[in-house]
Amino acid sequence: MTQYASPILTSLLDTDAYKLHMQQAVFHRYPAISVAAEFRCRGDELLGEYADEIGAQIALMSQLALTDAEFDYLSGLPFFREDYLNWLRDFRYDPQQVQIENHAGKLHIRIAGPWREVIMWEVPLLAVISEVVHRHRSPDVTPEMAVAHLRNKLAQFKAMSSDVDISRFKLMDFGTRRRFSQAVQQAIVGTLKNEFPYLVGTSNYDLAHQLDLAPVGTQAHEWFQAHQQISPVLANSQRAALQAWLDEYPDQLGIALTDCITMDAFLRDFGPQFAQRYQGLRHDSGDPFEWGEKAIAHFQKLGIDPMSKTLVFSDNLDLDKALALYRHFYQRVNLVFGIGTRLTCDIPGVKPLNIVIKLVECKGKPVAKLSDSPGKTICQDQAFVKALRKAFDLPLVKKAS
C-alpha cells in the first residue's frame, strides 16, 4: 500500500485560522504553560484499526514547515506580529507529543506538551484521521462527486431563497477538520468561490492563501478552558479569557465563542465593556434560535444596536438550517454561517465522522467544556465539573462524557 506512504498534509497552513490566531496569543502570553488534549469519537465507531496508518501520517507531519511564500502571505495580514511569525517559521510538529494506540478496537490519542505547540495538532490531525478512514471506506469517491452534490444543493438553495432578500447572507467554509479529503475541500471551496456569491471566507489558511479568500476564525473552546486553570479564581476565568483576547487583538478578530460553560453563564460575564468591544458572538451548541434571541436581547438591554454586531452560527449547520436562521434574524442583526462537515463531507453514501480533539488538562489540572448541548460536555473529572458549575452558578446536573 505504498500510495499511503505519501503525506496527506503538504502545508503547515492546512489548518484552521483560529489555531494560528490562538497560538500567537499563547506565544505572547502563556509560553511556559503545558496542556493535554484527547481524541473523542462521539459515535460508537471503532477506528482503532487505522492507528498505525494515522501514526505514520503523524510522523510525516514533522516535515511540515512554513515556506517563504507562506511567511510573506501571513506577514501581509493585519493579525500577526513579527516575533510570532519568526518563531512560527522555525516551528515543527513533534510526533513525540502524540500517543496513539488501538485500544480494543477504539482509537485512543493523547497529545501533551507546551500549549503553544500542542495547540497546532487538533485540526490537521482530525483531517488526517478523517481522510485515512474515508479512503478505506469509500475508495471510489472523487472530488467531482462531491462537487456534483454541492451544485444540487446550491440550486436548491437558490430556489428556496427566491422569496427573501438574500443579499446579506454570508457563508464561511469551516470544513477542514472533518473533510472527506484535502482534495474534496479544495474542490468544494473553489466551486463555492466561483459559483456562490455569498461565500465570504474559509477557516483554512492554506485555501485562503491559494484561492485568495478571507481567512476566518477567532478563538476555540480551548482558549476558555485553559483559563479555568490560568485564572487564580475559577469564577473569573471566562472574563479573564475574554480580556486576554482583547489585550492580544484590541480591534480585530472580535467574535467571542459563548458555549464553553453555557450561554447564560457567558452573558452574565459579557458586560457592557466586552459587549461594546467585541464585534459579535459565535453559536456552537444548543438551540440556535433561542441563542440568537438571547444575544439580541442582551445587546438591546445594554443599549447596543444589534445591527452593529454580528452573530456567527457554526453548530452542525447545512444550507437549509442556515437559510431558516437567516429568515428569522436577518432584519435584526448581521449574520454569518460557518458550515463544515455538510460542505466538505457531504457526499451520497458517505457517513461523516463525528470526531473531536479537546483540551482535558492545563498545568496538570482538569479543564472542562460544559456547552449548551449535554452530549458535547467534555471532562473526566466529576469533582471539577461540580466546582465549575458552582463557580458559574449552574444547576448540578448534566453528566460529563
From Swiss-Prot:
- Any GO molecular function: nicotinate phosphoribosyltransferase activity
Keyword Phosphoprotein (UniProt): yes
Q: What's a GO cellular component annotated to this UniProt protein?
A: cytosol
| Reaction equation(s) it catalyzes | nicotinate + 5-phospho-alpha-D-ribose 1-diphosphate + ATP + H2O = nicotinate beta-D-ribonucleotide + ADP + phosphate + diphosphate
Known EC number: 6.3.4.21
Q: Enumerate the UniProt keywords alphabetically.
A: Ligase, Phosphoprotein, Pyridine nucleotide biosynthesis
Kindly list the positions at which Phosphohistidine occurs in this protein.
H221
InterPro entries listed in its UniProt record? N/Namide_PRibTrfase, NAPRTase_N, Nic_PRibTrfase, Nic_PRibTrfase-Fam, Nicotinate_pribotase-like_C
Source taxon at top rank:
Bacteria
What metabolic or biological pathway is this protein involved in? Cofactor biosynthesis; NAD(+) biosynthesis; nicotinate D-ribonucleotide from nicotinate: step 1/1
What function does the entry list? Answer: Catalyzes the synthesis of beta-nicotinate D-ribonucleotide from nicotinate and 5-phospho-D-ribose 1-phosphate at the expense of ATP.
Gene name linked to the record: pncB
Give the matching PANTHER family.
NICOTINATE PHOSPHORIBOSYLTRANSFERASE
Organism for this UniProt entry: Serratia proteamaculans (strain 568)
SUPFAM superfamilies membership: Nicotinate/Quinolinate PRTase C-terminal domain-like, Nicotinate/Quinolinate PRTase N-terminal domain-like
Q: How is it modified after translation?
A: Transiently phosphorylated on a His residue during the reaction cycle. Phosphorylation strongly increases the affinity for substrates and increases the rate of nicotinate D-ribonucleotide production. Dephosphorylation regenerates the low-affinity form of the enzyme, leading to product release.
State what protein this is by name. Answer: Nicotinate phosphoribosyltransferase
Which BP terms does GO give this entry?
A: NAD biosynthetic process via the salvage pathway
User: Which Pfam families does the UniProt entry name for this protein?
Assistant: NAPRTase (PF04095), NAPRTase_N (PF17767)
* UniProt key word Ligase: yes
